[in-house]
């Protein structure tokens, strides 16, 4: 996944000087960043539906996403630009992402929340093949 990300950065023409590629347990990483006092202007997350950590920790998006988003708010800068969540979890609706963002990021920052489905157009039928959902908070400024 990191190699694919590096390729995308390179293909976009961006030098990547300020891009960090991190493979870690996201909750542990965010908790360390809070302790270090590090801040971010934007957060993009694409959490898995389910997973297990190195020590048997269980990740379940339906149980853990709200907590993750809330602790991520603690590492947003004073003037964040955006917070994007992408998910392919079948049991999660875009309205859930919208509500989580409204009750977390938008409560702390002035902005707007939008959500929707991610899909691939089927050329022959002009239908959309649903592939996932997104929730986005963005600054009004």
What is the meaning of each model-derived region?
Residues 32-34, 54-56, 95-96:
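Short, well-ordered secondary-structure micro-motifs
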Residues 7, 28, 67-74:
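Alpha-helical scaffolding segments of alpha/beta enzyme cores, especially the outer helices
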Residues 1-44:
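S-adenosyl-L-methionine
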Residues 71, 76-83:
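Short glycine-dipeptide loop
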Residues 16, 23-24, 40-71:
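Mobile active-site "lid"/loop adjacent to the S-adenosyl-L-methionine
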Residues 5, 23-25, 47, 54, ...:
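Active-site proximal loops enriched in glycine and acidic residues that flank catalytic Cys/His/Asp
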Residues 80-141:
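C-terminal catalytic and target-recognition region of SAM-dependent MTase-like enzymes
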Residues 13-15, 77, 109:
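Short, structurally constrained coil/turn elements
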């Amino acid at each position: 996944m990191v190699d694919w990300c590096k390729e995308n950065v390179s293909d976009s023409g961006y030098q990547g000087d300020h891009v960090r590629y991190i493979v870690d347990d996201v909750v542990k990483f965010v908790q360390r960043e809070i302790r270090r006092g590090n801040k971010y202007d934007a957060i993009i997350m694409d959490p898995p539906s389910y997973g297990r950590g190195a020590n048997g920790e269980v990740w379940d998006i339906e149980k853990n996403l709200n907590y993750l988003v809330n602790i991520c708010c603690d590492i947003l800068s004073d003037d964040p630009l955006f917070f994007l969540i992408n998910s392919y979890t079948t049991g999660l609706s875009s309205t859930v992402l919208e509500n989580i963002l409204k009750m977390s990021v938008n409560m702390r920052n002035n902005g707007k929340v939008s959500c929707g489905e991610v899909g691939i157009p089927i050329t022959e039928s002009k239908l959309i093949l649903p592939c996932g959902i997104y929730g986005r908070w963005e600054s009004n400024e």
